[in-house]
Amino acid sequence: MTLSEMAVDVLTTADGREKTRRSHAHAATWRAARAAGTLIPLGQATPPLHPARPDTPELLSPRDVPKRKPGSPTGRLALLHAVAHIELNAVDLHWDLIARFTHVSFPPGFYDDWVKAADEESKHFNLMCDCLESLGSHYGALPAHAGMWRAAEDTVD
């Protein structure tokens, strides 16, 4: 599998836990190859216009996401949910960037850094999900917005 195919594999996986599992596995494959002195072919695969998403959370316009007081228990839960959502978007944004720029002659270190960052964001998403679940909630329990992904859409050309 080429690096761009790995990126598209992550981007076309809807479930957050599975998406981050694949992200971690692809990052480990990339790192192992680099440690062995080889470079996985970059390839060229077209990323989807939108990453696959689970059925929840409901995605609202940023102005329509309910405001909550951060000092209240529900406000703290909403903050944790928002951070989990940010982390999942970051996973997609990192892999999207990798898929979009495999046609450019960047040094391998460029891809090393973005693969590492995608892997770290995957870890952060899972930590936030674990935290939400320990509090009796889960990712997707509250609405969120797609504002971060709009930046990728706005720069697709």
Question: Which residues fall in each region the model found?
Answer:
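Non-heme di-metal
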Residues: 1-157
